[in-house]
């Protein structure tokens, strides 16, 4: 935990003196001009075995990792290792060996070698569950041609600009209802403001949003009484993420052999996710079959079924993955965004001014407004820089490549340390400052291969456009209706629970500009 009031960089520097180097210091001198590629050299590359490493005994490394309780601070470990070994290092934990890189030019070079069917690291307990219990898989786990076939279909329905336009009338009312929910809380507290930790409310908001987009129907997650079956799904997703971390470095064949409580809880969480997703999909599937006309966009499920480009089993698998991936990830990013806005009131006022100007110029047309808030969209990128959902981005290069003058064999797991990159002054000036304007710079070198919060390329997050729209609409309505402040001034640290989460509750203060919620 960081010392109260001590900025992240200061705390890290005190703990590990020059962990974060400046340009021209330490390994910062390795940087080359954009376009050359930091890992490209005319010299004969050095062998893979010479890449700096803490040692080749994976089990000893893993023992030390566990002894230091490193699993929940792995993102800080990356920073420490880059300072110790330079801009590239390899590490073996148990049976898993990875090469870690941080330089944006190395990242750009890596992606040139990802091939037509990019491969990411499969989270072992997730994959083990699907294999052991013979669950259908979607684009999260599919490879090669089967992945590409599904992904092309999904891109049309969830990533294309025309598809995104259909989501606006589904997502906008959910954000408006969240504003109404906060007004109810204000009246309940009776102090003219609401003070509290809204983490659970954000989970409900995210699930209400993703299910509305998937099925074209509301579940009522923002009502006074929450659907208990839907709450079970949310709780299961939370448990699935939190039980994943202790299992990451355990050989999957040991899961069923020892049947630890962590594995049993993990299985139970996935069982609930599949059972509830199957139930929702089947209910809405039968409902859609009975309808012949739709006044409004009927949701992604209907469009996938109508296109007949994907088998029903594949539709269900991909819907399940998008539902599971659309709760904790989006809600956590919004919580971090509110936290950063509450600590940077001048930035919050800049964002509010942009939103209010957009409202006036667009005459209330929300679709037009969305085209007029570049700073707000940049603020989401800035939140993901400081608080990325995933601490690394992974690829298995299709062929041999050279990074930092080292030869990386094909199919080596290469991990881009995006948390460490986002906190390094070699790549971001004043890295601990919440400054969305950095993403609007005309100097593209300043942001080249740095915006990696949703991944990159054809294998980026399939729900990216939904999440971006959902968060933008949410923030528009929050900024129009409330001033957001911290209840107590102080830093909140992050812990790794497969996604980065706060180490303590974040208590926010919502001060309404009007005592009554706006009329939808």
Where are these regions (language model features)?
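N-terminal mitochondrial targeting presequence
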Residues: 1-46
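C-terminal helix/juxtamembrane-tail motif
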Residues: 80, 302, 499-520
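Conserved cytochrome P450 K-helix/beta-meander segment immediately N-terminal to the heme-binding cysteine loop
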Residues: 416-443
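Conserved cytochrome P450 K-helix E-x-x-R motif and the immediately C-terminal K′/meander segment
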Residues: 64-86, 275, 279, 363-404, ...
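Cytochrome P450 substrate-recognition site 1
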Residues: 35-69, 73-170, 174, 198, ...
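Cytochrome P450 heme-thiolate monooxygenase catalytic core
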Residues: 121-127, 131, 165-334, 350
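Cytochrome P450 heme-binding "Cys pocket" and the immediately downstream C-terminal segment
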Residues: 345-347, 440, 447, 465-501, ...
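Short, small-residue alpha-helix embedded
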Residues: 329-341, 474
């Amino acid at each position: 935990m960081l010392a109260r009031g001590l900025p992240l960089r200061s705390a890290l520097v005190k703990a590990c003196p020059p962990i974060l180097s400046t340009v021209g210091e330490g390994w910062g001198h390795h940087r080359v001009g954009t376009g050359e590629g930091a890992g490209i050299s005319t010299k004969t590359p050095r062998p893979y075995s010479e890449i700096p490493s803490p040692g080749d005994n994976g089990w000893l490394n893993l023992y030390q990792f566990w002894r230091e309780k490193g699993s929940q601070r792995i993102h800080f470990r990356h920073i420490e290792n880059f300072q110790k070994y330079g801009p590239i290092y390899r590490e073996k934990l148990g049976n898993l060996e990875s090469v870690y890189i941080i330089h944006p030019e190395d990242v750009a070079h890596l992606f040139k070698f990802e091939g037509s069917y990019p491969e990411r690291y499969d989270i072992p307990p997730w994959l083990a569950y699907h294999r052991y219990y013979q669950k259908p898989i979607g684009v999260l786990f599919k490879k090669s041609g089967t992945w590409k076939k599904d992904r092309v279909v999904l891109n049309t329905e969830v990533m294309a600009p025309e598809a995104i336009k259909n989501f606006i009338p589904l997502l906008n009312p959910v954000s408006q209802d969240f504003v109404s929910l906060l007004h109810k809380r204000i009246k309940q507290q009776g102090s003219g403001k609401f003070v509290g930790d809204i983490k659970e409310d954000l989970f409900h908001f995210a699930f209400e949003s993703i299910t509305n987009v998937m099925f074209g129907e509301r579940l009522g997650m923002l009502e006074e009484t929450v659907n208990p079956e839907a709450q079970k799904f949310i709780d299961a997703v939370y448990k699935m993420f939190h039980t994943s971390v202790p299992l990451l470095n355990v050989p999957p064949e040991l899961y069923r052999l020892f049947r630890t409580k962590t594995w049993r809880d993990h299985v139970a969480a996935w069982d609930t996710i599949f059972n509830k997703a199957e139930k929702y999909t089947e209910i809405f599937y039968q409902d859609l079959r009975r309808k012949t006309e739709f006044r409004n966009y009927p949701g992604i499920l209907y469009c996938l079924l109508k296109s007949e480009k994907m088998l029903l089993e594949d539709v269900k698998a991909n819907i399940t993955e998008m539902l599971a991936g659309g709760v904790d990830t989006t809600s956590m990013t919004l919580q971090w965004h509110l936290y950063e806005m509450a600590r940077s009131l001048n930035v919050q006022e800049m964002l509010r001014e942009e939103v209010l100007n957009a409202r006036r110029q667009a005459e209330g047309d929300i679709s037009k407004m969305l085209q007029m808030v570049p700073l707000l969209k940049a603020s989401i990128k800035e939140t993901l820089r400081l608080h990325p959902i995933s601490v690394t981005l992974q690829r298995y290069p299709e062929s041999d490549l050279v990074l930092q003058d080292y030869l990386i064999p094909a199919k080596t797991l290469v991990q881009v340390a995006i948390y460490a990159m986002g906190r390094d002054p070699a790549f971001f000036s004043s890295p601990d400052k919440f400054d969305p304007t950095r993403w609007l710079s005309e100097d593209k070198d300043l942001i080249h291969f740095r915006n990696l919060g949703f991944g990159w390329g054809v294998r980026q997050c399939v729900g990216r456009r939904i999440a971006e729209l959902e968060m933008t609409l949410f923030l528009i309505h929050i900024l129009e209706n409330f001033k957001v402040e911290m209840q107590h001034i102080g830093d909140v640290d992050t812990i790794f629970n497969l996604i980065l989460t706060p180490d303590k509750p974040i208590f926010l203060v919502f001060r309404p500009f009007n005592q009554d919620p706006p009329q939808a």
